[in-house]
């Protein structure tokens, strides 16, 4: 994190207004402005583990990663600066949670790119903190209001679920494929064979659907699931529990918190971070897999057909094969051999 996002650059146009403010930053925190902003006090709350990693180096205990904010996260703050994400239900979940903890009268700022749908903030907060647009620049909007009424927030009411092949999939706002199985994961699932054994790592696990489906017809498999997203981690735990399955689930920035080696790594890696296209996670996944696969272990991923993963797979493992494809997606497989670059 170094260069500021367009949303942060819009905020910096108003930096003089915040010198006496005690600010809680939340939402889609794509840079380190919360650590560098000149104000009386700065805290941050994030649901994204990689954002917490970057900010905690400078902010220490003043930034927290979790599914929901708690009273201690907003303590003494008189201002909320919320970075609008591209996912509207995620924004609603986070704003209702945070504003339920803040006292009436606090300043509420919402900033985001126009293409992210930041305009939705006005109707969303109309009953709680009526907003006015105070700036428009860098294809972003900045909105301000004061909290007039605290919303009610209950985590239980935000859970949703759907069924696939007799499995119950539990989801939360902000989890990939919240409303049903995506086409890419469906294609990857079609390649998984029954009676798989050994240790399997599911990177970017989302709601846990890949692992749950695999374990349902491979009872001897030992599952480990990880994701950068706090909602995804909680959803995966809930999915496993709902189906009587066992597995270790934790937050990790690709392999950052992963220990040991596995017989198979499966993933539907993201290629967006917020509004930005980013292949970083997938590249880290492919190049790092050699340090987390047993000899003969395999990496199996699904990706949009236009993404340049074959080149990275060949550079890292020496070869790859396409084991399933549609017009839009391909499932790539490669194996840990002596020629892999460790």
Curated annotation (Swiss-Prot):
It comes from Salmonella heidelberg (strain SL476). The lineage of its organism: Bacteria, Pseudomonadati, Pseudomonadota, Gammaproteobacteria, Enterobacterales. It catalyses: guanosine(1207) in 16S rRNA + S-adenosyl-L-methionine = N(2)-methylguanosine(1207) in 16S rRNA + S-adenosyl-L-homocysteine + H(+). The gene is rsmC. Transmembrane segments: none annotated. Its EC number is 2.1.1.172. It is found in: Cytoplasm. One of its GO terms (cellular component) is cytoplasm. One of its GO terms (molecular function) is 16S rRNA (guanine(1207)-N(2))-methyltransferase activity. Pfam families: MTS (PF05175), MTS_N (PF08468). Specifically methylates the guanine in position 1207 of 16S rRNA in the 30S particle. This is Ribosomal RNA small subunit methyltransferase C. Gene3D superfamilies: Vaccinia Virus protein VP39. The keyword Cell division does not apply. Its main location: cytoplasm.
């Amino acid at each position: 994190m170094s260069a500021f996002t367009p949303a942060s650059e819009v905020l910096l146009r108003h930096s003089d207004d915040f010198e006496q403010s005690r600010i809680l930053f939340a939402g889609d925190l794509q840079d380190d402005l919360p650590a560098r902003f000149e104000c009386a006090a700065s805290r941050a709350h994030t649901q994204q583990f990689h954002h917490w990693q970057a900010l905690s180096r400078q902010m220490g205990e003043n930034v927290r990663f979790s599914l929901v904010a708690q009273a201690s996260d907003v303590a003494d703050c008189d201002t909320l600066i919320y970075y609008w994400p591209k996912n509207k239900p995620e924004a609603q979940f986070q704003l209702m949670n945070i504003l339920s903890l803040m006292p009436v009268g606090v300043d509420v700022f919402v900033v985001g790119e126009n293409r992210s749908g930041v305009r939705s903030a006005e109707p969303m907060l109309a009953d709680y903190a009526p907003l006015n647009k105070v700036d428009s620049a860098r294809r972003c909007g900045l909105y301000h209001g004061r909290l007039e009424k605290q919303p009610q927030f209950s985590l239980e009411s935000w859970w949703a679920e759907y069924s696939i092949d007799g499995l119950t999939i539990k989801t939360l706002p902000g989890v990939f494929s919240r409303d049903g199985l995506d086409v890419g994961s469906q294609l990857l699932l079609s390649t998984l064979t029954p009676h798989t054994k050994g240790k399997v790592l599911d990177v970017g696990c989302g709601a846990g659907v890949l692992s749950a489906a695999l374990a349902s017809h491979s009872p001897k498999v030992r599952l480990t699931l990880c994701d950068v997203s706090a909602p995804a981690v909680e959803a995966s735990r809930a999915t496993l529990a709902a189906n009587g399955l066992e597995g270790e689930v934790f937050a990790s920035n690709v392999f950052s918190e992963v220990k040991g080696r596995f017989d198979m790594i499966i993933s539907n890696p993201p290629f967006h971070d917020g509004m930005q296209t980013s292949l970083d996670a997938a590249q880290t996944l492919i190049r790092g897999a050699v340090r987390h696969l047993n000899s003969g272990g395999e990496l199996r991923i699904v990706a949009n057909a236009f993404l340049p993963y074959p080149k990275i797979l060949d550079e890292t493992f020496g070869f790859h094969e396409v084991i399933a494809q549609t017009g839009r997606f391909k499932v790539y497989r490669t194996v840990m051999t002596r020629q892999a670059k460790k």
